[in-house]
Amino acid sequence: MHWLLSLVAKLPLGFLQGFGACIGELVFWLSPGYRRRTRDNLRHAGYNEAKFFTKVGRNAGRQSMESIWVWYRPAKTVLSRVKISPQAEHIIGSAMTSGRPIVFLTPHVGCFEILPVWLAGTHYEKTGRRITIL
């Protein structure tokens, strides 16, 4: 399996995102249980418009392909795609050097995947501070 995922990760990120979106939507339509749970969860959260339902499937598929790309690409390649504002970098840098505990809340799984790579490639080198990602 490792060799297959390594091979998949060599494909361009944009292609993987598009492919993942197609697979995610296909799974959404072919799995009645997944589709029902998705609709129920969205309705409970106040999203009743049908356009949201298939977007969840597409984005879940996209995220799965992005994760493979992040996990199996060299850190330098991943870091070359990270965009962060100077203000955010300053805030995170200050927190890292403070020695105080930090809790990172990320908007989706992809950010959760990239955050440790980014921290290791930037602030860890400066501070030597270890982090735990849960």
Outline where the language-model segments fall.
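Catalytic core of membrane glycerolipid acyltransferases/transacylases, capturing the structured
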Residues: S64, S98-L134
